[in-house]
């Protein structure tokens, strides 16, 4: 052991009780090297640093996940602290630590350094475990503990060691100011220097559906020397791509899963049609068109419209959308010094809300479209229409684009016997449909609130107008549109919703970039990506015109692949891949793709064929059809990743060919969807939990029933209406709200029969009798 080290250790030996003959030399050495901070027996006064709490917003410390600091094992040099002083008595040390924990002064000082009650408790538990479980402690803390045992030091002298340990398990304490600066989102216009370097002309084309607003913007786009169209859907991007090239204007297509070039040798065309997330904000254009600008408020995707609005480098930027976005867009562009020219349009064809509901599917006429908000309602209505000897086309969100277009062509074809359309709100944009009358099967739509909880609420005015506006389109066979509801008692509510003014949009969405997350990870290297996102959102500073978009889907993917060794940038890209987290096969495919990538094993066409067990057979029931839709989504995922990691996903052209084959198989299944529903019901593979509206399909029963609002997806076959208006009001509400399923209700009924035979026999018997018509 070196002499300086010996001097330092001897200088820290206790000068009080038990020091014996070594007290004098110890005092002399302390005079040379100085005493340990805090040896005066009071709370040490440490210099404030960036780790001290500060800033305008206190962080949500529940997001700080403590790291693990392992206790020290046996040292090769032995327990030097014990050699120079004495071995520590664990019982005495525990008493000292407990006393330290209970000190109000220590808790207050900890709070000054960002350790609130929760963090203080967690840090202390870790600190205590570290000290109690270590074979040998660092010499300095060993000596201080020994000094405290002999009353030569104060218990508060442990604070520097405690704070050091707290910063080890909560590294965010060291860099809060840096993190706040990184997550400062208060000046988004400054992120786009190319756009700020020019004076853009902004034209807002405002009007309802079928007013020609997008048409006028596209005409300017086609006449420009260069242009970019940014749409919300792949279908819309494809439509403009085809229209542009048909008009003799060379146009490329860019979506997340597809790139199409029309110029020879892959040369970039003067025009490009893309989904809004894919627009290039560094490329200069003469004209840019941003469609459906009101989606800037979308909780998940709004950031893409904000980025396009503020960042597109175009001499003219044409915005198409609802008037509700005018004020916000004007305010946002005021900060860039750009003025907004507003051009308002009126609907080209009249539309009227009928005074009578449909009430019965027997009253359907050619050109009718029944809008449902769940697949189960789609299946049930389609089956009821088929029973009446009518053909219907079916469109819902999870269908592949090719299948949607095929069903739209079938419905629009005047020579096709299919004259009825059953669809979800997926028809609200992206499809040209010849609809005469929109019939709302229900006005209740499931939605996800800010807390990620499922809610059943009436559709908004904006949603109702978007869907209703599909009736009587200018380019369709029907020059006048009509709107009504399936059920009589929904009609008044529909009129009320449609007559409400659309609430002005208050804020635009923002999203952290990969670079910002990388900087966070630099400061918090041991933190998971999901936790990094939580901390970023918590630290983010935005002004009243913006909000941070919901990142639950991103976090879901991050947690799914967290255990797979990937670089942060690669992990970030995988997490931004658009997947349906409700599809187990798609989620497991993302996991498998990430695992293959981490092993540096390319995902070849042959590997993918084996993985999905190609060839796939035509669907025999609804479950088979849903499985095929999931495989189609897996192909989309592969293609999306192939444009980000070309070497690891090398066979995009083969996969695209395979996807087209699958699209044909799915189209065949959807064409025969009523047969699939019938087979599924007969084999008990499809159990449809009726919503209140579904359970009262006209013709299903002769007795009228009370309307139960809501669209509830579940696992029970469609039932005839209740025979009594007063029966089971509470149970109906609970099922409607998603708090009970039909199976749970059955079980409760059985328990009521067992536990309260006298009280429950009559009512339960009535319920059971009601379900007899559907029993096998």
Curated annotation (Swiss-Prot):
Provide the binding site for ATP. 207-214
Spell out the Basic residues composition-biased ranges: 766-776
Q: Specify where the region named Disordered lies, as residue ranges.
A: 689-733, 751-776
Q: For the region Interaction with LAMTOR5, important for protein stability, what residue ranges are annotated?
A: 650-776
Q: Where are the transmembrane segments?
A: none
Q: Where is the transit peptide?
A: 1-40
MF terms in GO: 3'-5' RNA helicase activity; ATP binding; ATP hydrolysis activity; DNA binding; DNA helicase activity; double-stranded RNA binding; identical protein binding; protein homodimerization activity
SMART domains on file: HELICc (SM00490)
Does the record's keyword annotation contain NADP?
A: no
Q: What cofactor does its activity depend on?
A: Mg(2+); Mn(2+)
Q: What's a single GO CC term here?
A: mitochondrial matrix
Q: What does this protein do?
A: Major helicase player in mitochondrial RNA metabolism. Component of the mitochondrial degradosome (mtEXO) complex, that degrades 3' overhang double-stranded RNA with a 3'-to-5' directionality in an ATP-dependent manner. Involved in the degradation of non-coding mitochondrial transcripts (MT-ncRNA) and tRNA-like molecules. ATPase and ATP-dependent multisubstrate helicase, able to unwind double-stranded (ds) DNA and RNA, and RNA/DNA heteroduplexes in the 5'-to-3' direction.
| Subunit-structure text | Homodimer; in free form. Component of the mitochondrial degradosome (mtEXO) complex which is a heteropentamer containing 2 copies of SUPV3L1 and 3 copies of PNPT1. As part of mitochondrial degradosome complex, interacts with GRSF1 in a RNA-dependent manner; the interaction enhances the activity of the complex. Interacts with LAMTOR5/HBXIP, WRN and BLM.
**Could you identify this protein by its name?**
ATP-dependent RNA helicase SUPV3L1, mitochondrial
Q: What is the originating organism of this protein? A: Rattus norvegicus (Rat)
User: Taxonomically, what lineage is the organism?
Assistant: Eukaryota, Metazoa, Chordata, Craniata, Vertebrata
- Gene designation: Supv3l1
């Amino acid at each position: 052991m070196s002499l300086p080290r010996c001097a330092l250790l001897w200088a820290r030996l206790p000068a009080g009780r038990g020091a014996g003959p070594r007290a004098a030399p110890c005092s002399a050495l302390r005079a040379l090297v100085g005493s340990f901070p805090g040896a005066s027996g009071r709370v040490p006064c440490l210099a404030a640093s960036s780790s001290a709490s500060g800033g305008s917003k206190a962080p949500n410390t529940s997001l700080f996940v403590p790291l693990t600091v392992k206790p020290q094992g046996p040292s090769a040099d032995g327990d030097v602290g014990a050699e120079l002083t004495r071995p520590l008595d664990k019982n005495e040390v525990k008493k000292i630590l407990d006393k330290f924990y209970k000190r109000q002064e220590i808790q207050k000082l900890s709070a000054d350094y960002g350790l609130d009650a929760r963090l203080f408790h967690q840090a202390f538990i870790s600190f205590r475990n570290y000290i109690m479980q270590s074979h040998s402690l660092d010499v300095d803390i060993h000596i201080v503990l020994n000094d405290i045992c002999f009353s030569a030091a104060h218990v508060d002298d442990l604070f520097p060691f405690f704070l050091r340990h707290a910063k080890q398990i909560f590294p965010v304490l060291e860099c809060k100011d840096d993190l706040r600066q990184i997550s400062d989102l208060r000046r988004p216009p400054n992120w786009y220097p190319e756009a700020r370097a020019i004076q853009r002309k902004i034209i807002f084309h405002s009007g309802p559906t079928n007013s020609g607003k997008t048409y006028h913007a596209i005409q300017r786009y086609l006449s420009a020397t260069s242009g970019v169209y940014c749409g919300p859907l792949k279908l819309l991007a494809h439509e403009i791509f085809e229209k542009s090239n048909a008009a003799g204007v060379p146009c490329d297509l860019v979506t997340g899963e597809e790139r199409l070039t029309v110029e020879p040798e892959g040369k970039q065309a003067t025009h490009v049609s893309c989904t809004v997330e894919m627009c290039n904000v560094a490329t200069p254009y003469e004209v840019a068109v941003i469609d459906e600008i009101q989606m800037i408020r979308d909780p998940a995707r709004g950031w893409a419209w904000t980025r396009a609005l503020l960042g597109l480098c175009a001499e003219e930027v044409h915005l198409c959308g609802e008037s509700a976005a005018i004020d916000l867009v004007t305010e946002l562009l005021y900060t860039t010094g750009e003025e907004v020219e507003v051009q308002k349009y009126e609907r080209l064809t009249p539309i009227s809300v009928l005074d009578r509901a449909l009430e019965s599917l027997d009253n359907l006429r050619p050109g009718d479209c029944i809008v449902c908000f769940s697949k189960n309602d789609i299946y049930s209505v389609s089956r009821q229409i088929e029973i009446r000897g009518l053909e219907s086309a079916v469109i819902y969100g999870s269908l592949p684009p090719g299948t949607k277009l095929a069903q739209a062509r079938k419905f629009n074809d005047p020579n096709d016997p299919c004259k009825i359309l059953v669809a979800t709100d997926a028809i609200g944009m992206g499809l040209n449909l010849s609809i005469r009358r929109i019939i709302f099967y229900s006005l209740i739509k499931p939605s996800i609130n800010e807390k990620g909880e499922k809610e059943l609420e009436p559709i908004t005015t904006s949603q109702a107008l978007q869907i209703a506006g599909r009736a009587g389109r200018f380019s369709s066979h029907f020059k006048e549109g009509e709107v009504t509801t399936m059920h009589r008692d929904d009609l008044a509510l529909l009129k009320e919703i449609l007559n409400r003014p659309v609430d002005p949009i208050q804020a635009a969405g923002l999203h952290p970039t990969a670079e910002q997350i990388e900087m966070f990870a630099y400061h918090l290297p041991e933190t998971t990506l999901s936790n990094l996102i939580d901390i970023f959102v918590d630290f983010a500073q935005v002004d009243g015109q913006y909000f941070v978009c919901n990142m639950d889907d991103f976090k879901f993917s991050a947690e799914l692949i967290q255990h797979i060794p990937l670089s942060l940038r690669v992990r970030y890209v995988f997490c931004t891949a658009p997947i349906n987290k409700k599809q187990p096969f798609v989620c497991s495919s993302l996991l498998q793709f990430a695992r293959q990538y981490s092993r540096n094993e390319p995902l070849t066409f042959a590997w993918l064929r084996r993985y999905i067990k190609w060839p796939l057979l035509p669907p025999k029931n609804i479950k088979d059809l849903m499985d095929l839709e999931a495989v189609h989504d897996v192909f989309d995922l592969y293609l999306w990743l192939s444009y980000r990691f070309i070497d690891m996903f090398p066979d995009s052209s083969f996969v695209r060919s395979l996807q087209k084959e699958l699209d044909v198989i799915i189209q065949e299944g959807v064409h025969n969807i009523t047969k699939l529903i019938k087979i599924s019901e007969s084999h008990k593979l499809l159990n449809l939990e009726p919503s209140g509206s579904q359970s009262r399909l006209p013709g299903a029963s002769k007795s009228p029933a009370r309307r139960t609002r809501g669209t509830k997806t579940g696992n029970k076959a469609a039932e005839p209406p209740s025979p009594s208006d007063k029966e089971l009001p509470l149970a109906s509400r609970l099922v409607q709200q998603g708090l009970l399923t039909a199976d749970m209700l059955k079980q409760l009924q059985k328990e009521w029969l067992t536990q309260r035979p006298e009280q429950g026999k009559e009512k339960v018997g009535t319920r059971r009798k009601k379900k007899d018509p559907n029993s096998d």
